[in-house]
Amino acid sequence: MNNRVHQGHLARKRFGQNFLNDQFVIDSIVSAINPQKGQAMVEIGPGLAALTEPVGERLDKLTVIELDRDLAARLQTHPFLGPKLTIYQQDAMTFNFGELAEKMGQPLRVFGNLPYNISTPLMFHLFSYTDAIADMHFMLQKEVVNRLVAGPNSKAYGRLSVMAQYYCNVIPVLEVPPSAFTPPPKVDSAVVRLVPHATMPHPVKDVRVLSRITTEAFNQRRKTIRNSLGNLFSVEVLTGMGIDPAMRAENISVAQYCQMANYLAENAPLQES
């Protein structure tokens, strides 16, 4: 039997499809999301409706974004969900979540079992819409969740950690084994909750500068920041900010990266492109 076929649908490798089928895990995720009527609930990648059905049962309306046209068509004709759904058959990576929040008249509650092959770039796309998002619950590769929640001085801590924690409070919810999916992925999975900060704990003047600094630092994470960021900061400037130039990218806190970004935004602002 082909383990890539589930409920008559052949999982497409190019879409990174692995379908959730463990009822205990499904119930645990829905409880964590806790959907309520009247909320602007949005699911990315509903697939074969493992989460869509139990979430949809609690709601009058549900918006879904599904790239796979066959799966989008199945949802349109779903016996009880169909009338409740607004289906966008398009790529979540190019979706304008700000426009949708404006249309729905409230911040969005976004959730989904995300295709692992696009999860990191999709996170960065969603971070640009945190003003329009109330919270997010995602099933991701466990390694990605570890990176999202990691603190300084750990191997998992990287650019994704800094940018996620700049925008959101990041909370791990539960771990999920490969056996909970068809076909089983080759990696462990985990569910994470991301809640955009109501008030930024470390506001930056230009988030593009923060993005640039973290990219340059973590692209050369084995180097000291005296070397990896030497083109942006002198030793004197780093020392003046209370940051040891002998530290590496993984030793610097989110607050310190934001401090560095604000210094650069004031003293060497990026030109508008």
Swiss-Prot record:
The keyword Methyltransferase applies. Its EC number is 2.1.1.182. It is found in: Cytoplasm. It comes from the Bacteria. Keywords: Cytoplasm, Methyltransferase, RNA-binding, rRNA processing, S-adenosyl-L-methionine, Transferase. It catalyses: adenosine(1518)/adenosine(1519) in 16S rRNA + 4 S-adenosyl-L-methionine = N(6)-dimethyladenosine(1518)/N(6)-dimethyladenosine(1519) in 16S rRNA + 4 S-adenosyl-L-homocysteine + 4 H(+). S-adenosyl-L-methionine binds at residues 18, 20, 45, 66, 91, 113. InterPro entries: KsgA/Erm, rRNA_Ade_diMease-like_C, rRNA_Ade_Mease_Trfase_CS, rRNA_Ade_methylase_Trfase_N, rRNA_adenine_dimethylase, SAM-dependent_MTases_sf. The keyword Acetylation does not apply. GO terms for cellular component: cytosol. It is an enzyme of class 2 (transferase). One of its GO terms (molecular function) is 16S rRNA (adenine(1518)-N(6)/adenine(1519)-N(6))-dimethyltransferase activity. It holds the Pfam family RrnaAD. HAMAP family: 16SrRNA_methyltr_A (MF_00607). Belongs to the class I-like SAM-binding methyltransferase superfamily. rRNA adenine N(6)-methyltransferase family. RsmA subfamily. Specifically dimethylates two adjacent adenosines (A1518 and A1519) in the loop of a conserved hairpin near the 3'-end of 16S rRNA in the 30S particle. May play a critical role in biogenesis of 30S subunits. This is Ribosomal RNA small subunit methyltransferase A. It comes from Escherichia coli O139:H28 (strain E24377A / ETEC). The lineage of its organism: Bacteria, Pseudomonadati, Pseudomonadota, Gammaproteobacteria, Enterobacterales.
